[in-house]
């Protein structure tokens, strides 16, 4: 319980009987990774509950009178629908409950994946993420394996020692692909080592349209104030929507579900048409 009398927090201890609408999570990282927390519900139930929550917040809690609310237009794709993901490197891999129970010392504690909720310096090693086209998984895992094999130092998110920091993958409906590797570089030999990694990525994945890199020697991960360098290809990719072409750069914002963005804009056009 929190200190506020109106707030109650609970955690599951035991299931006596599952709901008939309960779904089996399809991701091997479900329950540990902080994303996709509603995988135990079919997508149709997810959007139904989300609409109910918004309506309750406005009407029951906010006392706002609302007109009839149209149902949520769900995404046609519920897997591999994002066009952008950012992965984090860390020399402190999150150990699963099963690994902790084994009570052994693990030789490999580097990881690339997603931050663990409430543990900013630890990263869950991701083998397969269902959010983005599978090329994203293949690139991430290839970079990870190359870094393991050649002893690249992963960043320590507390002391800021190390080299490898982040990797961003952007895909598009045009088939173009952008990869951005972000590292901390303070010595010439580190830069040479970093460029070897970039060359490996370029050689292994010739389908990459835009291979970029950023040197970030700050304590935070923001890149908006940093220079972006082109290692191979263009400094941008293109996205298309209904005959319109959008130039997407490494710092650009574009709705992360490209197909659903078009659905949204069609609704806007419908409501604004005379």
Language model feature labels by segment:
Residues 1-5, 9, 271-274:
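Single conserved hydrophobic/aromatic residue that forms the stacking wall/gate
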Residues 6-229, 266:
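SAM-dependent transferase fold signal centered on methyltransferase-like domains
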Residues 232-273:
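SAM-dependent Rossmann-like transferase core, predominantly class I methyltransferases
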